[in-house]
Amino acid sequence: KLKAIIEENQAQDYIHLKGHQDLTEVYKDYELYLSGSKSEGFGLTLLEAVGSGLGMIGFDVRYGNQTFIKDNENGYLIPRFEKDDEPAIVAALAEKIVAFFNRSDLDHVHQVSYDIAKGFLTEEIEQKWLNLVKEMTSHD
């Protein structure tokens, strides 16, 4: 359906559907993942980035960022702004980027990200489901 919309609008020269891309090798070239969205769900890119041990910076929005960013541990959560004050938002983001690269404990940052990601390994998720099913089916 997306392909048809792209063709209908003659946009195939500049819109290309690439499918899922494995970014594991790409993440190895970076130290930091920035999540600039003002709303976020459980994002696969967030999980991939934290699983690659990257430092994380994002806005303190419900779900995704709060799940993967432990403020002052593996990066920074930037408080939400009540209104769209773009200069203040950009300044807050820039301040946290500078603070991140001024840290002397980047090895700790990377380890915290790895530790967060461990909770999302297939074996961990399977065990959580098994525990839930056992809890729900036990007759006390």
Features from the language model and the residues they span:
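Aromatic "clamp/platform" in nucleotide-sugar-dependent glycosyltransferases that forms part
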Residues: K38
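A short hydrophobic beta-strand element within the catalytic core of glycosyltransferases
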Residues: Y33-L34, I57
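Active-site donor-binding acidic/aromatic loop of nucleotide-activated sugar
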Residues: Q12-H20
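C-terminal alpha-helical cap of glycosyltransferases
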Residues: V98-N102, G119-D140
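Short alpha-helical donor nucleotide-sugar binding micro-motif in glycosyltransferases
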Residues: H20-Q21, E25-Y30
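Short hydrophobic beta-strand element within catalytic cores of glycosyltransferases
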Residues: G55-F59, I69
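A short, well-ordered alpha-helix in the C-terminal region of glycosyltransferases
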Residues: D105-G119
